[in-house]
Amino acid sequence: MKLLGYDDWSEEKINYFYGGTTQSQTNRRNLELERFRETKANNNFVDYEDFFYNHQRFSSNTRLNVSGGTDKTKFFVAGGINDENGLIKNTGFQRYTVRANIDQKITNAIQLSVNSSYIRSNTDRGFTGNQNRTGASIGYAIAATPNYYDLRQRPDGTYPDNPYFTENPIALTDKSTNNSLVNRSISSFNLGIDLFKGESSYMKFVLNGGLDYLQNTTNIHLPEDLQYQRSIANPGDIMNGKQESFNTNLQAASVYNFNLKRVNMNSQVGMVRLDFKDDLLFVRGQGLAPLQKNVKQAAVQTIFNQFFMRTQEAGIFLQQEANFEDKIIGTLGVRFDKSSLNGDPSKLFAFPKASLAMNLTSFDFLKDHFISQLKPRIAYGETAGPVAFGATYSSLVGVNIGGLLGSSLSTTVGNVNILPETAKELELGVDVGILKNRLSLEATYYIKNTANNIQPLNLSPSSGFTSTSSNLAELSNKGIELSLSGTPFERENFKWNSRLMFWKNDITISKLGIPTYTTGGFGVSYGTFLMKEGEKLGTIVGNPQINPGEYTVWGNSQPKFNMSFNNNFTIYKNFDFSFLFDWKKGGYNVNLTNLNLDEGGNSKDWFGDRNGDGIPNGKQREPEPFNNAGRFVEDASYIKLREVGLYYSMPTEVTQRLFKNKVQRFRAGISGNNLVMITKYSGYDPETSTFGNGLANNIDVGPYPSARRFFLNLSLDF
């Protein structure tokens, strides 16, 4: 894995970092010098980055598949165990899966398929990222702590307090819990009934549906004897969350296929029903009794959040396909949807679609040509995104006045006219193949415009409300996708398959409808995201201020383009070697990990002097004027060797002889992920987003470092 490295401390650096002439500054400087000299004499420096992150951990992934059946009944059963130990102590991930599929031919006219799976995952996340004023972040703590202060556990089992930050990260890691346990069950069925079959037509009825049950239990525990907890009024913090989701879907459709002379027609009409049920409870206890983890054993007990969500959606769809001898293929369709989330839950919204494709090589003028495929295509479609739950209504909040419980209106007012966000997309493309498709090109250009984008609209204070949801914003999305694949070289004992992909996407705020604002991050001092009509989505702005309310543009989180290069080599029919490169050009991150390192004096080049003016780099970051928001906005371009694999498949006759016909296939190999990363980005990984916000992403705040992974692979078929 990539480590950032830390700047070494010296007496000269301490005298500068803790400079000052007041008595308190002098006392602090002398104290730090004493600590440094003692550590130096005992050679007891601690590289905290190495201590927490630089570890080799074992992971395993085991799968077992069993399949079989008869001409009427076929089955597939699979199970898997995935066990990953995290880089950081007491972190990791385990997943257990069971899956069963059954295909039953009830009669010649009735077929039934049933699929079911169960997934149980257990995640110990640890404490990285933003610390939310709890001290619970390894990244924050080690950025502030010099390497000459030893925070490790003492022989008597205690942990020293951290004088440089609000928490000792080693005690935090050893004693605290941040766990998520998920149980999920997914089942589905598909029933097909052939109503009639003729020589040139048939009609069938299709009924399919499914259910998805998810239970997610989260637990965060910060013991009362942690440093930060001892500094607050109610030490000892326990936070328990429980989410239960039960979703079902049911779809019924009639399909009629017939020939209209030389044109095959396929007609569909159907309806769909979706039901969503979500219950969430998040409780918190503060001021825990010693050694307790029960909310009821806390001095302050709070229902931090609770909601019950019930959503219903229904739709009707019609579709007509026409296929002229596989030469010209066209589709027309429309879907009518309604949702209980919309302002008018009974209103049906229409979403049409159409597509046309032509296989020109199926016509006589291109038959037996070196161009083996030439397929221009065009498609248009409309769709919608859901309205946020509760946007229609003005919710009530609980109040306590003189010991009497009551309810009052929230400051956010509902919008009974709220509409779903809609998208209209036009796609133009062509698929080209030459030399019997030994070389293929796929090219697509698309324009996607979204309307009725939901944004908060601030209201006049005299209204008594602060904001409401609005449908005023519009986005314009334009992009291109290219794929070039082929077999550059093929002989009896060697085959090379290759695929090169390129994609580029630009999103512009074509209409905002509300006043310009910034969102995400920690404000204009460090870099935040601009929401302004005519600007690209993801524009990063910050100090210095140009005009009142207008700040310097430092970059954009959208990449200029992405590329991938995938190759597979088959050697002597038994060896397979493959690798995948990913390249992202452009796209900026707000790197606040460096902010924390600079503030703690620990960034790798902190005491260097790049421009020779006598001021350390950590106190004077480019670009000029120094120490503006631009110093945290970095180009996050990268080239990554994403995957590499080398596998050997034993010849069938050798396998059967070696395993006495008990094993039909034996395959072994080695593989790796994230083996090479080429980037100028100074953080752990340019692929980071601490908050996962779609509008304001690409913020780097003490993340969990990404790891290089190596696997030994064994596969046996019995």
Placement of each model-derived feature along the sequence:
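Membrane-interface anchoring segments and C-terminal beta-barrel signals
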Residues: 369-371, 602, 613-718
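Residues embedded in well-ordered regular secondary structure
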Residues: 1-89, 127-130, 174-175, 179, ...
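Surface-exposed, extracytoplasmic segments of Gram-negative outer-membrane nutrient-acquisition systems
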Residues: 32-39, 404-410, 449-472, 506-557, ...
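Outer-membrane beta-barrel signature, preferentially recognizing the C-terminal barrel domain
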Residues: 170-176, 300-317, 400-440, 468-491, ...
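Outer-membrane beta-barrel transmembrane domain signature of Gram-negative proteins
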Residues: 35-67, 71, 223, 232-329, ...
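Solvent-exposed loop/turn elements at secondary-structure boundaries
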Residues: 277-301, 364-422, 438-475, 513-545
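Transmembrane beta-barrel strand/turn architecture of Gram-negative outer membrane proteins
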Residues: 70-152, 177-216, 237-277, 282, ...
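A surface-exposed, glycine/aromatic-enriched loop/edge motif typical of exported proteins
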Residues: 1-30, 119-160, 282, 374-399, ...
